[in-house]
Every structure is written in C-alpha cells, then in structure tokens.
Swiss-Prot record:
It comes from the Bacteria. It is an enzyme of class 7 (translocase). It comes from Nitrosospira multiformis (strain ATCC 25196 / NCIMB 11849 / C 71). GO terms for cellular component: plasma membrane. Binds 2 [4Fe-4S] clusters per subunit. GO terms for molecular function: 4 iron, 4 sulfur cluster binding; iron ion binding; NADH:ubiquinone reductase (non-electrogenic) activity; quinone binding. Keywords: 4Fe-4S, Cell inner membrane, Cell membrane, Iron, Iron-sulfur, Membrane, Metal-binding, NAD, Quinone, Repeat, Translocase, Ubiquinone. SUPFAM superfamilies: 4Fe-4S ferredoxins. It is found in: Cell inner membrane. The gene is nuoI1. Belongs to the complex I 23 kDa subunit family. This is NADH-quinone oxidoreductase subunit I 1. Residues 41-71, 81-110 form the 4Fe-4S ferredoxin-type domain. Its EC number is 7.1.1.-. GO terms for biological process: aerobic respiration.
C-alpha cells in the first residue's frame, strides 16, 4: 500500500516538471559552440581553394574516409584534383581539421545529414567547397608560408634556434 502511494506521489510531482524531450523537427536542439558537424572546404580571401593537397588530413583520419589526389596548376600551385569524404564512415573526430596547415578543412555545426541511400553520403570536392572563407576570413596560406620575418635572419626570430650545418654533426 505504501509503495503504491509513493509511486502515485512521484508521478504527481513529475507532471509539473519541465520535459526533457524536445520535438526535434519542430524545435531545433541547442548545439554547443564547438560542435563538430559536417566538413567543408573553404577558400582563401582571393577566391582560390585553400587546400594544397598535402595529404595530412587523409593521414590523420583514423577511419580512412578521406581520399584525394594532388595536381598542380600553371603557377605550380598544388590543389586536389579530386577530394572525397565518405560521411558514412566519418566519426567527426576533427583530426582532419587540426592537421590541415592551410585551414582549408573546417567542421560546421550542421548535423542533419540523414540519407536513405548510403551512396549519397560520399561527398565530392564540388559538394564540400563553399564560396566563403569560413572561420578564418583574413588568412591566406601563400601570403605567410615561407616569408621571411622583416629585419631578422634565419634563426633570429623569437624562440628559434640558428640553422644547423648537418656536416658539422658527422664524426
């Protein structure tokens, strides 16, 4: 008898509590600020592709869902001939974004990627490229890569050791 009354009392109290479940298609869930969702390829401020096809993203991917092939344009600038991500295998770990030296790969808060056909989850470069610069609007890899710091020689920058002659290390 006591257990039945206790159960009814708990049910009565729960009637006035806020519901935990949200009605998903009608109400959108609150996404955390650092949510790792759909992967995109961004462009630099000049409108060119940021990706230099260095294969670091494919090497960092633990499930091997990234495939790309490098090629060069007439200015000897590398870019991916094709860039393919299989989202049916992707675990959205973000290692590819961390490994990318040019900030070309970025993860967006988009999480609605449900498909009826698994083949539709293989995204090509055209599906991944966006028109804008993404999270880093002023960054252009080719403006800062290999550029000497003004007024300082090699090894003269802060926390930088002077260059080592490899022949001096030989016995």
């Amino acid at each position: 008898m006591w257990n039945s009354l206790k159960t009814m009392w708990i049910v009565f109290l729960h009637m006035f509590r806020r519901r935990v479940t949200i009605q998903y298609p009608d109400e959108m869930p609150n996404i955390p600020p650092r949510w790792r969702g759909r992967i995109i390829l961004s462009r630099d401020p000049d409108g060119e592709e940021r990706c230099v096809a260095c294969y670091l993203c494919a090497a960092a991917c633990p499930v091997d869902c990234i495939a790309l092939q490098a090629t060069e344009d007439e200015h000897e600038r590398r870019y991916p001939e094709f860039f393919r991500i299989n989202f049916s295998r992707c675990i959205f770990c973000g290692f590819c974004e961390e490994a990318c030296p040019t900030d070309a790969i970025q993860l967006t808060p988009d999480f609605e990627m449900g498909e009826y056909n698994r083949k539709n989850l293989v995204y090509e470069k055209e599906d991944l490229l966006i028109d804008g610069t993404g999270k880093y609007p002023g960054y252009n890899f080719y403006r800062v890569a290999g550029v000497a710091i003004g007024g300082k020689n090699k090894g003269g920058a802060e926390n930088e050791a002077p260059p080592v002659d490899p022949h001096s290390l030989l016995p």
